């Protein structure tokens, strides 16, 4: 019986110490024709959620420099989400309002 206790305790300890970091969701608010915060830093696997808090205006999130197509427009009280799997710096802007800019930085 004692021969089984130590291996079982060792396995339980190893399982308990190998926690996997849970992916996080970071919120960027769109209001008054601005992305707030304008710059965010996340880890690979994290999600950015853009929330449109305007009263009447639609927006989009476009990673044009990365060669992406423009995301669908989203209207007040709607959201757009994107998961970032690779490290790097990803500038973006609003398609209909190119003066609205932001940057997502992804690093370990």
Model-identified regions with their sequence ranges:
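Bacterial N-terminal signal peptides that target proteins for export
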Residues: 1-7
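Extracytoplasmic copper-binding redox domains, predominantly the cupredoxin/blue-copper superfamily
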Residues: 2, 19-108
């Amino acid at each position: 019986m004692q021969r089984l206790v130590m291996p079982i305790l060792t396995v339980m300890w190893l399982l308990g110490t190998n926690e996997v970091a849970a992916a996080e969701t970071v919120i960027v608010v769109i209001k008054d024709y601005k992305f707030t915060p304008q710059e965010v830093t996340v880890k690979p696997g994290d999600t950015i959620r853009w929330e449109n808090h305007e009263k009447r205006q639609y927006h989009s999130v476009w990673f044009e420099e990365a060669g992406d197509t423009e995301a669908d427009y989203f209207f007040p009280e709607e959201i757009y989400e994107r998961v970032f799997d690779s490290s790097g710096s990803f500038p973006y802007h609003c398609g209909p309002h190119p003066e609205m800019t932001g940057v997502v930085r992804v690093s370990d």
